[in-house]
Amino acid sequence: MKNYSKNATHLITVLLFSFVVILLIIPSKCEAVSNDMQPLEARSADLIPEPRYIIDVPPRCPPGSKFIKNRCRVIVP
């Protein structure tokens, strides 16, 4: 008879522990789902830092050419 009560105590302990774990996991899963359901603009606004000033630097041209009107042009001597 003692063996049955020990098994029952162990079973109840395992069930209580799993119940507590489930209670801890479910709210975090729901929060993740609610974050996924937000519009893309709302989520990306949190991730993107403030815009930095972009300096328009012309591309480098090979030797013997210059950057003229958005293209590298070969200068004929």
From Swiss-Prot:
Signal peptide (UniProt feature, chain positions): 1-32
Organism: Vespa velutina nigrithorax
Keywords, alphabetical: Disulfide bond, Secreted, Signal
Cellular compartment(s): Secreted
Residues making up the propeptide: 33-52
Tissue and organ distribution: Expressed by the venom gland.
InterPro entries membership: Secapin
Record carries keyword Aminoacyl-tRNA synthetase: no
Protein name per UniProt: Secapin
